[in-house]
Amino acid sequence: MQPISRRDALGALGAAGLAAVLSPLAAQGARMQSWPLGTPRRTGIHDVAPAPDGGVWYTAQRSGHLGWFDPKSGRSELVALGPGSSPHGVIQGPDKAAWITDSGQGAIVRVGWPDRGVRAYPLPDGTPYANLNTAAFDGAGDLWFTGQSGIVGKVAVQTGAVSVKPAPRGRGPYGICATPGGDVWWCSLAGSYIARIDRRSGESTVVEPPTKNQGARRVWSDSRGRIWVSEWNSGNLSVHDPASGRWQVWKLPGDAPRAYAVYVDERDVVWVSDFGGNAVFSFDPRRERFERYGFDREAAGVRQILGRSGEVWLPESGTEHISVIRTA
């Protein structure tokens, strides 16, 4: 593996409360820009998803809202999700709406856009507290989701029916993703494995990684359908090729890396956040090369990464900031 190039972000807060922090980054012209959320109350920002209007949604886990951030003005808007809400994950659906995993309400919540209409899809009656985490849409347009208490579930979007299945080996389901072919994979943080869902039966088949007790936290597919895994316990970034069954593993740079979020952009560049180093890394699989993007703020706490063409969005759960790395 080649040495990393360190590109620590530079810049300082401007005088205006919502002024952006610009961080020029060398080489490929990528740059980081950051904003304080500037909301009247602490949101507990957790996950982000690009919205169809050029804004960015975020889950306000602490306040029970869906946030919408406007990069042009630096302004945030909060949409209340319901009593007891504690949203975790958010993604944009095929219908251009925000779909949210809300562990506080024990429901999947849809927020229409731009009408902001809120609809909850509760888990089936009798389902214990699920600790809902993340969601992904399959090739048929149905939503699959994880519950860290030990479930994997589905919302049949056309009918609104919600079903759940117990996860293999109990608690731990966390990250989930869909491949370009429409298949769905998820990972177990407590179980240290990844799994593929049979979309017809809802059952999951476990795939064992080469590193024991690695703490698979999140997964993401590249354009070839390979599954990239952020390993919390081991500090590794790994990839599984379902076609060949082959695994590859790379240790994140640094003394004590803690890999949390993983995302693959439109160029098949992999992005992974490191709690141990207060940084985000890009990884070029062709050159097997990491590039580091550091934060000016301590304990940024990037728990998830998502983007759109030319933009990689980062929610800073530890600082109430939102950041973007522009790659084009």
Q: At which residue positions do the language-model features occur?
A:
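Conserved beta-strand positions in repeat-built beta-propeller and related beta-rich domains
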Residues: W57-R62, I100-G104, L143-S149, W186-A190, ...
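Short loop/turn segments that connect beta-strands within beta-propeller blades
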Residues: D70-G74, G112-R116, A156-G160, D198-G202, ...
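Beta-propeller fold detector
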Residues: Q33-P36, E77-L81, R119-L123, S163-A167, ...
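Beta-rich, blade/repeat-based domains predominating
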Residues: P40-P52, P83-P94, G126-A140, G170-G181, ...
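Blade-level signature of beta-propeller repeat domains, shared across WD40, Kelch, NHL, RCC1
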Residues: R303-A328
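A short loop-to-beta-strand structural motif that recurs across blades of beta-propeller domains
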Residues: H65-G67, A107-V109, I151-G153, Y193-A195, ...
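N-terminal secretory signal peptides and thylakoid transit peptides that target proteins
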Residues: M1-A16
